[in-house]
């Protein structure tokens, strides 16, 4: 039998993007004395993984550096409650299920909502708010009221359609699906918490994939890390019109008064959402936090989906907007320049 030449294996990872992402997250972990940090970047149009980094990391050529906690690819092996980064998808579900439209106003009351024996609180009072304002001010009550107006299956169905609760398809060792709730009976507070990112857990790669689907105007593109041309398994999972509405709302979060204003990149339209979730521990929640920023750029025609996670930052500064967002901005700025994405000078919303 004649010998066959081996085929070359080419990754979609861009070495330049990998380098700026690793440098930024390594610095952030050191600055905030955090336990770990992760970054994943996807090409919105193709689903290609452009960068995937973790800190602490290790040098595979140096065996003395091989410690298990350094060798985990946390982007796929670690699942966590997504906190407020999930809120754009609640608004998307409300639009898709006809319980809200672009002009809907939600009355969030005095900032405290009683549900049975529990309470849902907002960090800042928003009163009667548009969908855009609910996202901009990250109102827990706003998304709770939207979630209560649709069957729980409708919200979970949308979460599932953008990739939550499913393996990414990258076929990398150690990947987990996260924890996706499947109960048959839901209390009001359980329905509320899944709307602001508690009660389910997802991986960083799933979060990036969901944002990429939003940026691709509702077209779900399977993600891949090995270059290959023989794939077109994309499918439209939400309407283009509703995805565009949510994208434009997401942009307001990086503008003045928004929780992700430190994720902005000068000259570009950026849409991003921050999240801060308390870590689950035996019997409840601990005093440790995970901070996130997830988003897209440029909003005019999204090219890059990016998720930045800083795990257990120490000190008084533990919000996603102040810990993860500056890292997001630094990486996104470098990536847009490296990929020669033209600035948005004339495309800003009036």
Locate predicted features.
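Solvent-exposed, charged/polar functional surfaces in cytosolic regulatory/catalytic domains
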Residues: 24-27, 252, 256, 334
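Short alpha-helical functional segments enriched in proximate histidine and acidic residues
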Residues: 28-31, 142, 338
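Beta-lactam-recognizing serine transpeptidase/beta-lactamase-like catalytic domain environment
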Residues: 1-4, 13, 39-84, 89-313, ...
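Flexible helix-coil linker/hinge segments at domain or subdomain boundaries
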Residues: 334-344
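Conserved, well-ordered alpha-helix/loop/beta-strand core segments that scaffold catalytic motifs
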Residues: 1-37
């Amino acid at each position: 039998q004649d010998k066959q030449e081996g085929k070359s294996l080419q990754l979609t990872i861009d070495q330049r993007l990998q380098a700026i992402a690793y440098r930024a997250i390594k610095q952030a972990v050191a600055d905030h004395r955090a336990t770990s940090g992760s970054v994943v970047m996807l090409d919105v149009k193709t689903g290609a993984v452009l960068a995937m980094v973790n800190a602490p990391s290790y040098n595979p050529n140096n065996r003395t550096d091989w410690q298990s906690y350094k060798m985990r690819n946390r982007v796929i092996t670690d699942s966590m409650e997504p906190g407020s980064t999930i809120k754009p998808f609640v608004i998307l579900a409300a639009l898709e299920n006809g319980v809200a439209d672009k002009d809907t106003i939600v009355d969030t009351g005095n900032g405290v909502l009683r549900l049975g024996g529990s309470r849902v609180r907002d960090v800042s009072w928003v009163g009667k708010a548009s969908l855009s304002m609910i996202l901009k001010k990250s109102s827990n009550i706003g998304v709770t009221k939207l979630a209560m107006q649709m069957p729980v299956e409708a919200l979970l169905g949308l979460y599932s359609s953008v990739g939550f609760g499913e393996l990414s398809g990258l076929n990398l060792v150690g990947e987990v699906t996260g924890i996706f709730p499947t109960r048959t009976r839901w209390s009001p507070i359980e329905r509320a918490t899944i709307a602001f990112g508690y009660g389910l857990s997802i991986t960083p790669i799933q979060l990036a994939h969901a944002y990429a689907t939003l940026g691709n105007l509702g077209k779900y593109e399977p993600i891949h890390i090995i270059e290959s041309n023989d794939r077109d398994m994309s499918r439209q999972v939400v309407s283009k019109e509703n995805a565009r509405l949510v994208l434009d709302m997401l942009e307001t979060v990086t503008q003045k008064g928004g929780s992700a204003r430190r994720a902005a990149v000068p000259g570009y339209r950026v849409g991003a959402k921050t999240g801060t979730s308390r870590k689950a521990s035996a019997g409840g929640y601990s005093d440790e936090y995970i901070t996130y920023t997830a988003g897209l750029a440029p909003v005019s025609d999204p090219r890059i989906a990016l998720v930045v996670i800083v795990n257990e930052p120490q000190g008084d500064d533990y919000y996603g907007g102040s810990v993860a967002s500056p890292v997001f901005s630094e990486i996104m700025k470098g990536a847009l320049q490296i990929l020669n994405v033209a600035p948005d000078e004339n495309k800003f919303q009036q």
